[in-house]
Regions:
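Double-stranded RNA-binding/processing signature
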Residues: 1-4
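Mg2+-dependent prenyl diphosphate-binding active-site environment of isoprenoid biosynthetic enzymes
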Residues: 6, 10, 19, 23-271, ...
């Protein structure tokens, strides 16, 4: 699967269809959910779900709910990350952050609602009918593990606790693995699970996801010091302002670029665990490593 306009349109339509009706008393909440969920972005995680599903012989129909669920989790995390009690960022994807439009109270609840909607989407009658009970249950287990206290949320806690501490590289590695790589890793595994893949394929996809996930975060650190707010669609330089350690502050830009290249090659090598054509995923990994926004 390539990141074509048709693919992007299918993802956007699927996400919209998952949202509750806006004809209700809690319309402001639904508006806030839609505001962030439909704000665009790279859609890396659903793309990986669809790509690994296809690689394992699945169908777009079987991948849709899994792709939507992981993007809902990602979107809720961004809403919460931007709150004043967290990163206190006013800009996301080139638009005012959710709490700047709807208020902190509704933004908090919109994030909570997207979190719960993700698991409803994975386990509703339609998804179970398409993918089977076993795949849906395993999907819930994988997504909750990688998004929870020992995954994405745990990474955010380490991030908060690392402010003004000059955290060493070991802490940074753990934080970035949990905060960023875990959900990308989950997306790769979910794509395989939705297609009924075997454990060997899931393990290979997991390794690919972990490598590009960490590379993705290192590239983010590079862009945070080499790009502008307008180019990235979000504030840059906030890590330095909050005295947070980053790969760039600890290792320098050139070493970071070397690490991104090494991790990307390792990710591509992990794809050798599949019998199908992995060319598009390989190209995607290289493109992600060279992104400028």
């Amino acid at each position: 699967m390539t990141m074509t306009k048709d693919y992007a349109k299918n993802i956007e339509n699927a996400l919209k269809s998952c949202l509750p009706s806006m004809d209700c008393r809690e319309k402001k909440l639904i508006d806030a959910m839609a505001y962030s969920l439909e704000a665009g972005g790279k859609r890396v995680r659903p793309y990986l779900v669809f790509s690994f599903n296809s690689l394992c012989g699945g169908s777009e129909e079987s991948a849709t709910a899994f792709g939507c669920a992981v993007e809902m989790i990602h979107t809720y995390s961004l809403i919460h990350d931007d709150l004043p009690c967290m990163d206190n960022d006013d800009l996301r994807r080139g638009k005012p952050s959710n709490h700047k439009v709807f208020g902190e109270d509704i933004a908090l609840l919109a994030g909570d609602a997207l979190l719960t909607l993700a698991f409803e989407t994975l386990t509703n009658e339609k998804t179970v009918k398409i993918c089977g009970t076993s795949a849906c249950c395993r999907g819930v287990s994988v997504l909750s593990k990688y998004a929870g206290a020992t995954g994405m949320i745990g990474g955010q806690v380490i991030d908060l606790m690392s402010e003004n501490t000059n955290a060493p590289i070991e802490v940074l590695r753990e934080m970035d693995y949990k905060k960023t790589a875990c959900l990308i890793k989950a997306a790769c595994e979910l794509g395989c699970i939705s297609a009924g893949a075997n454990d060997k394929q899931i393990k290979a996809a997991s390794e690919f996801g972990e490598c590009i996930g960490i590379a993705f975060q290192i590239q983010d650190d590079i862009l945070d010091v080499t790009s502008s707010d307008e180019e990235l669609g979000k504030p840059v330089g906030s890590d330095a302002e909050n005295s947070k350690s980053t790969y760039v502050s600890l290792l320098g830009i050139e070493k970071c670029r070397e690490l991104v290249d090494e991790l990307t090659e390792k990710a591509v090598n992990a794809l050798h665990g599949f019998d199908g054509d992995t060319k598009e995923l390989e190209e995607f990994a290289y493109k992600l490593a060279k992104r400028n926004k």
